[in-house]
Swiss-Prot record:
Keyword Nucleus appears in the UniProt entry: no
Job of this protein: Methyltransferase which catalyzes the transfer of a methyl group onto N-acetylserotonin, producing melatonin (N-acetyl-5-methoxytryptamine).
EC number: 2.1.1.4
Pfam families the record matches: Dimerisation (PF08100), Methyltransf_2 (PF00891)
Protein name: Acetylserotonin O-methyltransferase 3
Tissue distribution: Expressed at low levels in roots, shoots, leaves, stems and flowers.
Gene3D superfamilies: Vaccinia Virus protein VP39, Winged helix-like DNA-binding domain superfamily/Winged helix DNA-binding domain
Subunit structure: Homodimer.
Lineage: Eukaryota, Viridiplantae, Streptophyta, Embryophyta, Tracheophyta
GO terms of biological process kind: biosynthetic process; melatonin biosynthetic process; methylation
Binding site for S-adenosyl-L-homocysteine: 209, 232, 253, 267
Organism: Oryza sativa subsp. japonica
Catalysis: reaction(s): N-acetylserotonin + S-adenosyl-L-methionine = melatonin + S-adenosyl-L-homocysteine + H(+)
Length: 366
């Protein structure tokens, strides 16, 4: 053992290697600062401040727009270096002063009036959330403590489930539901532009776990002939806006019953459940839809790990998303894992279309 340690030390005799190794270690340790700086910029409404200032703003402009005390100006400069280095915002020299502008990423942080199609500021607040982050600091306990075996990392950290907090904390629940609406709008805008054929020939659709109906509204607007039903828990559909005449909201439990329709949509639902529960949900879906020769299918929108763009960012996003979902004992699946639960639920075939970058459309046929 001692000899092996000595050999490993000798492999790092180069000063350059040691320096590079230390830099990489620090870089990994400080990676969370990217997320917290992004969250801070989102909560400070930096994107909106730049937008209100004509699309470009100095530090002084930002401070004035967001009502920042002058003593915090130098700290704002330090904070803004993080999202500019990582490409969330752009910066250039303007007469010796830093001038910040929006990028395609920071435009997604614009709040607008709540109706902006491409807005994800609330999603950032859900993903980079102190409750969620604390859960990941409990993962080691979840792995090693026997009494934690039947709990999620979130329960280990907080003594209750994530869903209980969403249901009982009005503010947290509102942010979460708004985030799901935002994400649905962006996803459906892409799908309806790039892969609208998945909805062709459908006369009725049930969006299972469809929240406030953002996905259903997009489908009903693009395909007025499709009668859409949104199924979600009673307290969620009770708060849903009734803005579209072609959408019906039904309160219920998708483990117990799913209304009959040509097609069932499951968008970002199954990744929150383990395989046995996914099989139960899919069997309920199979009971609700038409036969395959009559156009019946289940449309799933989820990550398929290993399928999609080969660039490092989307590949890494899939892996990070998978570990992120551990906090509620969820999982992002590879194709063979999806296939296993489809067959166990009684489906005969499926088709994967990687149209959403790191996420895909999966059409599953009875």
């Amino acid at each position: 053992m001692a000899q092996r340690v000595q050999e490993e030390d000798e492999q790092m005799t180069s000063t350059d290697d040691l320096i590079q190794a230390e830099i990489e270690l620090y870089h990994h340790c400080f990676a969370f600062i990217k997320s917290t700086a992004l969250r801070a910029a989102t909560d400070l409404c930096i994107s909106d401040a730049i937008h209100r200032n004509g699309g470009a703003a100095t530090l002084s402009d930002l401070a004035l727009n967001i009502g920042l005390h002058p003593t915090k100006l130098s700290h704002l400069r330090r904070l803004m270096r993080v999202p500019t280095v990582s490409g969330v915002f752009a910066v250039e020299d303007h007469n010796g002063e830093a001038m910040y502008t929006l990028t395609r990423v920071s435009r997604l942080l614009l709040n607008g009036d709540g109706e902006r199609t491409h807005a994800l500021s609330h999603l950032v607040r859900v993903l980079v959330n102190p409750l969620t982050v604390a859960s990941h600091f409990s993962i080691h306990e979840w792995f090693t403590i026997e009494q934690a075996a039947a709990m999620t990392p979130f329960e280990v950290a907080h003594g209750c489930t994530r869903w209980e907090i969403i249901a009982n904390d009005a503010k947290d629940g509102s942010v979460f539901n708004t985030a799901m609406v935002e994400d649905s709008r962006v996803a459906m805008d892409i799908i309806l532009k790039e892969s609208c054929g998945v909805f062709q020939g459908i006369s009725s659709l049930v969006d299972v776990g469809g929240g406030h109906g953002a996905a259903a509204a997009a489908i009903a607007t693009a395909f007025p002939n499709i009668k859409c039903t949104v199924l979600d828990l009673p307290h969620i559909v009770a708060e849903a806006p009734t803005t579209h005449s072609n959408i019906q909201f039904v309160g219920g439990d998708f483990f117990e019953f799913i209304p009959a329709a040509d097609v069932v949509l499951l968008k970002y639902i199954l990744h929150a459940w383990q395989d046995d529960d996914c099989v139960k949900i899919l069997r309920r879906c199979k009971e609700a839809i038409l036969a395959r020769d009559a156009g019946g299918k289940v449309i799933i929108i989820e990550v398929v790990v290993g399928i999609g763009p080969k660039e490092i960012v989307p590949k890494e996003m899939q892996i990070l998303f998978d570990v992120f979902m551990m906090y509620v004992d969820g999982i992002e699946r590879e194709e063979h894992e999806w296939k296993k639960i489809f067959l166990e639920a009684g489906f005969s075939d499926y088709k994967i279309t990687p149209v959403l970058g790191a996420r895909s459309i999966i059409e599953v046929y009875p």
